[in-house]
Curated annotation (Swiss-Prot):
Protein name: Probable transcriptional regulatory protein YcdB
Family the entry assigns: Belongs to the TACO1 family. YeeN subfamily.
Gene designation: ycdB
Localization terms from the record: Cytoplasm
GO molecular function per UniProt: DNA binding
Taxonomy, superkingdom: Bacteria
């Protein structure tokens, strides 16, 4: 899965460059998690996980605290998760995951974004069957066999463990992501650069320069939408 991890890194790096967007989207995700349970990460595991991911993305503490304080203060916004699937040029596939306080607005915006950027939105399940929902854990290390043994002993359902450029990359069943993180922490590994659920394509396509330009415009437009939290695709050369 090495190449797949390389693509995830490339997408994260490109997205993380737009820091204000990243901060704002994590702020919404933290607020929503805090509103759904206690606004205390020690008693709300979902909130704790989002905060850990925000820290990995270098979201400042004041942004995290502001979102939690808003939830504590009785903010009345309710956010709903969504997923929209569609197609770009020449066999390219896209999944956009959303978190919104206005579903009608989000549906209209995502549909318009696809149509204006050479794509077509599909029905639920139109492309997601070609992606594997996967837990991804990344940390510094060079001994994947040792890490695999740790996870095996902890009865974590692991799909693969690889070493990529001085990093260990663990792929788990989505239901075992948190179990995998806990097992690694128990083994003394406490610093992670990524702990995410990712939709990883089962196969990839390469686009011509002309099609790639169109497709890149579609991805950029989706990622610029404030309601879109994550965008996944199957294009190898983006």
């Amino acid at each position: 899965m090495g190449r797949k991890w390389a693509n995830i890194v490339a997408k994260k790096t490109a997205k993380d460059g737009a820091t204000s967007k990243v901060y704002a989207k994590f702020g919404v995700e933290i607020y929503a998690a805090a509103k759904q349970g206690e606004p205390d990460p020690e008693s709300n595991s979902s909130l704790k996980f989002v905060i850990e991911r925000a820290k990995q993305a270098q979201v400042p503490k004041h942004v995290i605290d502001k979102a939690i304080d808003k939830a504590k203060g009785g903010g009345d916004e309710t956010f709903v998760q969504g997923r929209y699937e569609g197609f770009g040029p020449n066999g390219s596939m896209v999944i956009a995951e959303t978190l919104t306080s206005n579903v009608n607005r989000t549906i209209a915006n995502v549909r318009t974004t696809f149509h204006k950027n050479g794509g077509n939105i599909g029905a639920a399940g139109a492309v997601s069957y070609m992606f594997d929902n996967t837990g991804v854990i990344v940390f510094e290390g060079t001994d994947p066999d040792h890490i695999f043994e740790i996870l095996l002993d902890a009865e974590v359902d692991v799909r693969d463990v690889t070493e990529e450029e001085g990093n260990i990359v663990v792929y788990t069943e989505p239901t075992d992501l948190h179990k995998g993180i806990a097992a690694l922490k128990e083994a003394g590994i406490t610093e992670f650069s990524t702990t995410e659920l990712e939709m990883i394509p089962q196969s990839e396509v390469e686009l011509s320069p002309e099609d790639l330009e169109i497709f890149e415009g579609l991805i950029d437009a989706l990622e610029d939408d404030d309601d879109v939290q994550k965008v996944y695709h199957n294009v190898a050369n983006l």
